[in-house]
Amino acid sequence: RIDGKLIANRLEPGKRPRSSMAPTIVLKDGRPIIIIGSPGGSNIISFVVNSIIALLEWDMNIQEAVSHPHAINKWGKFEIEESLYSSNLENSLKAMGYDTKIRKYYSGLNGIYIDTEIYGGSDPRREGIALGN
């Protein structure tokens, strides 16, 4: 409480956040190298983390990373974005015991990658813009 008023979304043990917002800044040697965020309700965290992995582990540039199709595991069911769908992927997931669901996603990621220059990337699934040098 502040001045006797309850604080919405205050951090407390056992509470769940009222939002999945995940605006993220990734640092390297104390300096920002990635700034990224997305709308998308309960999918936001997966959208952001998948894009960071695409940048850092799969050597995609920022535009490729925010445009990449999604496959998200929710409570044991893999939701596969239509543009990523293949029967091989679906059959492989089912062979591992996962249920699957094919769907559209409207992530709307926007991000900036900073190296020797600044690069912007904006998800083509929604309107947006992120500019670099």
Regions found by a protein language model. Give the residues of each.
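Active-site rim segments in enzyme catalytic domains, especially the processed small/beta chain
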Residues: 1-34, 58
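Cofactor-centric catalytic regions
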Residues: 85-133
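Flexible loop/turn segments at secondary-structure boundaries
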Residues: 33-34, 42-45, 74, 85-88, ...
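Alpha-helical support elements that line or immediately flank enzyme active sites
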Residues: 39-60
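Short, solvent-exposed loop/turn segments at the edges of secondary structure
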Residues: 6, 18-21, 47, 73, ...
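Extended C-terminal subregions enriched in glycine
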Residues: 14-17, 57-105
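Hydrophobic, well-ordered secondary-structure elements that form the walls
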Residues: 25, 48, 65, 112
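Second-shell loop/turn segments in exported
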Residues: 35-39, 77-80
